[in-house]
Curated annotation (Swiss-Prot):
It catalyses: tRNA(Phe) + L-phenylalanine + ATP = L-phenylalanyl-tRNA(Phe) + AMP + diphosphate + H(+). Its cofactor is Mg(2+). Belongs to the class-II aminoacyl-tRNA synthetase family. Phe-tRNA synthetase alpha subunit type 1 subfamily. InterPro entries: aa-tRNA-synth_II (IPR006195), aa-tRNA-synth_II/BPL/LPL (IPR045864), Phe-tRNA-synth_IIc_asu (IPR004529), Phe-tRNA_ligase_II_N (IPR004188), Phe_tRNA_ligase_alpha1_bac (IPR022911), Phenylalanyl-tRNA_Synthase (IPR002319), tRNA-bd_arm (IPR010978). This is Phenylalanine--tRNA ligase alpha subunit. It is found in: Cytoplasm. GO terms for biological process: phenylalanyl-tRNA aminoacylation. CDD domains: PheRS_alpha_core (cd00496). GO terms for cellular component: cytoplasm. Its EC number is 6.1.1.20. Mg(2+) binds at E252.
Length: 327
């Protein structure tokens, strides 16, 4: 192998002449590839006596290693040149102002809850909360809801077993509050509730706000005046409002409240009524001495009406394009 040293010298010279990584790779293939000059030297070993082959093979491998080291060194140098050139072209002016972080915003339903809490807080209402996993007594029995009522059915309610369920309303908190304290009582109860329903205007989980007053000489007139003031404050306009007779097991008389929409049609916004005497008796309050009114409304429903949202499900999809409109 008299010309092995010459091949190594030519390879090193070619390595130094390569001006970029692509050209350098061509040199590697030419000398160290499967059919490269140095690789083919291994085929000449068969012409040597067996006892000379190990030494000759070691010489060839040493030559290949020298060329590989030269390739590695040249590649590192070329990549360094490219990196330095790119860094020079991407010089950052550190005197420029930093990139400002975008401020977040409250979810529209949270805005609605906060707005309602503020209004009723100014009227002396306190905010109460309670468990979302409820028992049938607080969710149904104490509220004068009979055993055969459709709300108890499996297709409407998420039951864990025969006595425990995901609450279908926040009214259970009213029961707990009336049992824990004597009148006068003035509370609102915001929270998540669960019903087995899902379409454009219903979701299995939604937010509800209920209100309750219990005191002496509370009348339906007090209820109407409170809700008139609330709705006009919430929608920020002098709305046309009507009360329709309705039925709820826990209030008597009961009503549903509508507001006149911009399209000239009535829109239902909440339900209300005077607390049923049986409910007061169930919590140990004498209905001959005290009376009260209660109301309940869906937060998503009010938010849809306030902001003109047509699909309830948009509130739960976390689409920033939608949510940024409410910042």
């Amino acid at each position: 192998m008299p010309h092995l040293a010459e091949l190594v010298a030519k390879a090193k010279a070619a390595v130094e002449d390569a001006q970029d990584v692509a050209a350098l790779d061509l040199v590697r293939v030419e000398y160290l590839g499967k059919k490269g000059h140095l690789t083919l030297q291994m085929t000449s070993l068969r012409e040597l006596p067996a006892e000379e082959r190990p030494a000759a093979g070691a010489v060839i491998n040493q030559a290949k290693q020298e060329v590989q080291e030269a390739l590695n060194a040249r590649k590192e140098k070329l990549e360094s040149v490219v990196l330095n050139a790119r860094l020079a072209a991407e010089t950052i002016d550190v005197s420029l102002p930093g990139r400002r972080m975008e401020n977040g915003g409250l979810h529209p339903v949270t805005r609605t809850i906060d707005r309602i809490e503020t209004f009723f807080g100014e009227l002396g209402f306190s905010v109460e909360s309670g468990p979302e996993i409820e028992d049938d007594y607080h969710n149904f029995d104490a509220l004068n809801i009979p055993a055969h009522h459709p709300a108890r059915a499996d297709h409407d309610t998420f039951w864990f077993d025969t006595t425990r369920l995901l609450r279908t309303q926040t009214s259970g908190v009213q029961i707990r509050t009336m049992k824990a304290q004597q009148p006068p009582i003035r509370i609102i109860v915001p929270g998540r509730v669960y019903r087995n329903d899902y379409d454009q205007t219903h979701t299995p989980m939604f937010h509800q706000m209920e209100g309750l007053i219990v005191d002496k000489d509370i009348s339906f007139t007090n209820l109407k005046g409170t809700l008139h003031d609330f709705l006009r404050n919430f929608f920020e306009e002098d709305l046309q409002i009507r009360f329709r007779p309705s039925y709820f097991p826990f209030t008597e008389p009961s009503a549903e409240v509508d507001v006149m929409g911009k399209n000239g049609k009535w829109l239902e916004v909440l339900g209300c009524g005077m607390v049923h005497p049986n409910v007061l008796r169930n919590v140990g309050i004498d209905p001959e001495v005290y009376s009260g009114f209660a109301f309940g409304m869906g937060m998503e429903r009010l938010t849809m009406l306030r902001y003109g949202v047509t699909d309830l499900r948009a509130f739960f999809e976390n689409d920033l394009r939608f949510l940024k409109q409410f910042k």
